[in-house]
Amino acid sequence: TADAVRRARESGIHVVVSTGRICGEARDFALMLGTDDQMVTSGGATLSSVSQERCTMRMSMPGEAAVRASAVVERIGMITMVYAGETLLITPYDDIEFGKYKSNEGYLSSKKVVPSVAEYIATNHVSVDKMFIRSQDPVMLVRARAQLEQIPGIRVMSSAADNLEVITPAADKGVALGMLCRELGTDLDHAAAIGDSENDLEMLNAVALPIAMGNASAAVKNLCLRETLTNAQDGVAAAIDRIIAENG
């Protein structure tokens, strides 16, 4: 995939990372792939810079809504990461659980462990950009989603069967990508996007050429004009190479 990104950039095409991950973690991917400096991060709630190692734009959720949402997931006992700018707020229990599979530098350098995230953000008036909630129990996810959706000022979505993501209703990857395009001197009418899950829908809807990964959900495939190979088959590289060929 890094080779395809390099070929695209050499031919004058901008390639940016658009992800649900926080700035530090997204930066790891951007450096590995060799993409442009600007990134859409935190599911569209933030724009970030690889070189500056920080958010350049934030759309945070209302303070009270963020505290209430954190309290809900803490009460149910679900592991959660709360994104506040460049910092990931987690509890000691979250740290143990996420630590089982997260060891990348971006995660380790971003995390801040506090006894209660809900209490911490309420006491310190922390602006929250996103919450990432994970569970292997589908019943718990349904229960949490039902409770979270009753809180005004937030939007609940998912990027996989085992998670929930919470952001402000004003933010999505499509809006953020539009802002990023303007920074690059272009617009969404000249943009393509590649996605596979619910949190990609707004971005795919916003661009001129929406491309579904081969492993994408049915909702994503139905929305897209084109389908590429799966993640396992380097579908992103295949999609980029086809765009290079068409613009050659």
Please identify what each model-predicted range represents:
Residues 33-35, 42-43, 51, 151-152, ...:
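Short, structured coil segments at secondary-structure junctions
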Residues 72, 76-79, 83-194, 198, ...:
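Conserved acidic, metal-coordinating active-site core of Asp-based
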Residues 8, 19, 43, 131, ...:
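Residue-level signal for inorganic ion chemistry
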Residues 12-16, 36-37, 130, 189-191, ...:
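Short active-site oxyanion
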Residues 2-102:
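Active-site phosphate-binding/coordination module
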Residues 1, 22, 43, 86, ...:
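A generic "binding-loop/recognition-motif" signal
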Residues 164-248:
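Mg2+-dependent phosphoryl-transfer enzymes with acidic/Ser/Thr/Gly-rich catalytic loops
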